[in-house]
Amino acid sequence: MTNLRKTHPIIKIINHSFIDLPTPSNISAWWNFGSLLGICLIIQILTGLFLAMHYTSDTLTAFSSVAHICRDVNYGWLIRNLHANGASMFFMCLFIHVGRGIYYGSYLFKETWNIGVILLLTVMATAFVGYVLPWGQMSFWGATVITNLLSAIPYIGNTLVEWIWGGFSVDKATLTRFFAFHFILPFIIMALAMVHLLFLHETGSNNPTGLNPNSDKIPFHPYYTIKDALGFMLMILVLMTLAMFSPDLLGDPDNFTPANPLNTPPHIKPEWYFLFAYAILRSIPNKLGGVLALLASILVLIIIPLLHMSKQRSLMFRPISQFLFWLLTANLLTLTWIGGQPVEQPFIIIGQLASILYFTLIIVLMPLAGMLEDNMLEPKFP
C-alpha cells in the first residue's frame, strides 16, 4: 500500500511543505520567525473571531462593547489582551524576520521578498484599522490624523479623504467600514502568506552562509518541526506573560477615554510598531513631503535587491556591512523613541538626522560597503 502522505492530493502538498521539505542543515534560530508569524496570524484570527462575536461597530456602543467583553464575557479580558498584545508580538516577529532577510541576503529571492513587502504593508493596514475599533480617544484621533494625510495628494486628496470617511469627519460610517476591513484583511494576509511560501519553496531556503546549500539538506520533519515547536512555546510564554501581568504596557492611556471629537489629546501617537514611520513622517515640515517619506520608509524595502552590490550574499563574512546593519537597527530604535516624543527641540533635530541616516544607510552606505569589501578581497599582485 502506498503511503497516503505521499499520494493524497491535499496531504501531499502539506507533506512537501512541512514534512519532506529539503531544508539547509545550518539555518539558525533567526529562521524561526516565519513560522512564528504563522502562529501569530492564527492566534490573531481566532481571538479576533471571538471578539467580533461580542463587538458592535457603532460609535455609540463600540467603547461600551469592548468594556462589556472585558467585564461580562467568559475570559473576554484574556481574549482581548491576547489580541491586543498579539499584535505587538506579530510586529516584533515581522521586524526580526525582515531584519534577518536583510542581514543574510534573503531578498535575492525577489518574488518571495516582494510578496513579503506587500504582506508587511497589508499587516500594517490591518493593525491601523484595528486600532480604531475600540473607539477611544487615541483610536479616533489616530484615525483622523492618519486618514487626513491623504488630503496631501494633489487634486483628488480632499475627495479621497471624504470618500474613505464616508462623510465629512471620522464617524459611524468610518468605524463600520474599518471593522469590515479589519475582518477581511487577515484572510487576505493568510492567502498572501501561502503565495509567499509557494515562491519560497520554488527556490528553497537561504542559510546563514549565503552559499548554495543543495549539497547538505535534511528533511524539515523532525529536525525543524521540533525547533519550530520550541519557538512557539517561547513566544506563547512571552505573549501570555504580557497579556496576564501587564496587558496595558504597550497601549496608550488615552484609549481608556471614550472618543470625543471636541477634545484633542495632548500628544497624538500611534502604537509603538508605527512610531519609526511616524517619526519619519513628522521630520519633514511639509505635508505631502512627509507622506512621501512615510511611504518611502517602507517601500524602500522593494529596491533593496537592486542595491545589492556585493559578490557575497550574506553579511556573515562582511564586517563593514555588519556594522552598518547594526547602525541601521540602532537608528530604527532611535526613530521609535523619537516618534513617541512631543514635537519640540531637541527631538525635532534628532528625528530629522535619524530619518536622513535611515535612507542614507540603506540607499548609499550599504551598497558602497559591499563594493568596498569586494575590493578589499581582490588579490593585489605587484
Curated annotation (Swiss-Prot):
InterPro entries: Cyt_b/b6_C, Cyt_b/b6_C_sf, Cyt_b/b6_N, Cytb/b6-like_sf, Cytochrome_b, Cytochrome_b_C_euk/bac, Cytochrome_b_N_euk/bac, Di-haem_cyt_TM. Heme b b562 binds at H83, H182. GO terms for biological process: mitochondrial electron transport, ubiquinol to cytochrome c. The keyword Membrane applies. It comes from the Eukaryota. The chain crosses the membrane at residues 33-53, 77-98, 113-133, 178-198, 226-246, 288-308, 320-340, 347-367. It is found in: Mitochondrion inner membrane. One of its GO terms (molecular function) is metal ion binding. It is a multi-pass membrane protein. The keyword Heme applies. Keywords: Electron transport, Heme, Iron, Membrane, Metal-binding, Mitochondrion, Mitochondrion inner membrane, Respiratory chain, Transmembrane, Transmembrane helix, Transport, Ubiquinone. Belongs to the cytochrome b family. This is Cytochrome b.
